[in-house]
């Protein structure tokens, strides 16, 4: 089973996935944790449209073909169960020789990241969660001054991220595509607000 935890930067995706993993494990389900952040493109590709380009952030951040080939397809229905959790170290800006692992039968992939309801990914998910946190309430970026006043200053690095997220919302409508939408403004009290 492939489960996606999607939401804007700083919405609490990794936190929620990390909290769900041991619960599923305690219920006797083998869990594989992975993140889209291990599938970045190299820096040259990510910034080919410019360091402040929202379009570049949305279109060129992640290597979805590699994600599908090395993780989603092997773990999907009829897949080989031989997978890799990572292909790229974004901090070192270099590929990693990720260890090929073999999933136990019945494993659940709990995968977190941004942009997970893009057309090229959405059909892979057996279940998906979208964490609904407005940009101004974003747990990470709300501390950045430019995020607190609506649209970030176009010269701010935050402009790339905020407008890239808005592009994703316009093109993919992740709230509509998700199996459930969780209001995660209050990390201590998440609330399901929509279900398919």
Language-model features and meaning:
Residues 8:
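P-loop (Walker A) phosphate-binding loop of NTP-binding proteins
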Residues 3-4:
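Short hydrophobic/aromatic beta-strand immediately N-terminal to the Walker A/P-loop
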Residues 13:
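Conserved lysine of the Walker
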Residues 123, 127, 131, 140, ...:
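NTP-dependent small-molecule kinase module
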Residues 93-147:
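ATP-dependent NMP and nucleoside kinases share a basic, alpha-helical "lid"
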Residues 32-35, 41-94, 108:
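Conserved nucleotide-sensing/catalytic segment adjacent to the nucleotide-binding pocket
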Residues 22-32:
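Post-Walker A helix-loop "phosphate-sensing" segment adjacent to the P-loop in P-loop NTPases
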Residues 16:
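Hydrophobic positions on the alpha1 helix immediately C-terminal to the Walker A/P-loop
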